[in-house]
């Protein structure tokens, strides 16, 4: 995989390399997000022991590690006579530190820890002995997010408090797609983001000269597609998981629109409490997130909770691939599925939540808001001459660090222009959020522009802002 712009992260590592102290950095993030490429770019022109662990016995891992140490140190004997223990490896690294600055990067460290549980204690001991040596730069890296947050960076981890820095590498945000899809329109880039998300490995697979439909067929739907089995590879990284089929059933339910815990439990045939535990595990893995109205004062106690798949590609796969795998055996099947189901459903699939999330991210950056998200709840409205409680939702709400609503927005991914009535409804709901406070600004986002009346009113209202898709990219 090619190295893509990780300027901030690379700069942070380089600044630590120049610091007058030992460094111990934890770098983790989901599979395919670019951790290895970042480490290798950082390691350029540095004396480095880089080791990418794989599942295997301790002796196999030490043999591979000895080869990496031999390449970095010039001690060819290590390759012929591998080290026999991790204690011996850390002793050898200690000797190498006497020769000058040394970067030691242990990638996919979760495989080492599972095979040799005592390695964490050995690292702690090594760090205690050498934390005063400015020649040492140690990186632990890996793809098992739940393992790293539990065993490496969490409060209960044996290594907690010893690291000097940590980086949780995330997928690229939507605006970064311009580097992967040169020449694509903002509309098509949003569609691509809805399918492939911001994971560099997935985006690298795309052919910018081909259409989105061609890329989806070739890489996701075809039997030999590069990403056809990607979710299964993703789950294979987590050896502590049991009942993969149940987790897949949960993700499939969420992708189909069942976002409340009781709806998910009913779909997978588990109790609410058992489903809650499974959802907790998926959240630990960074695959699912808990969503609540952005204005909720105490998110941990609210009952207004929904669950969302956090990765657009996983959402697409569980919506359009997993339920139909039994009929996708040939390339001709993939073409038929693409034209018969995927493309006719794509605009609806893009509209929510992906287009709304793109608008939320833009507004967060534009306003410097503390938090931006959805809002939903009960609103009193006059229906048939009487006041009734009506359930309403807002696509975008931004709040500041005081919890005050700064802005409210509406998003429309449709072929027609956004009508003036959208502003009227948005204004009424925004007033409901701030009945006694200052009126928030209104932001209206539209794929296809705005009608003449709405445009005219917005021109004369400094608190009303119209945003087209071209401004988002």
Regions found by a protein language model. Give the residues of each.
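Phosphate-binding site recognition
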Residues: 1-337
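A cross-kingdom feature that marks ATP-driven nucleic-acid transaction machinery
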Residues: 301-473
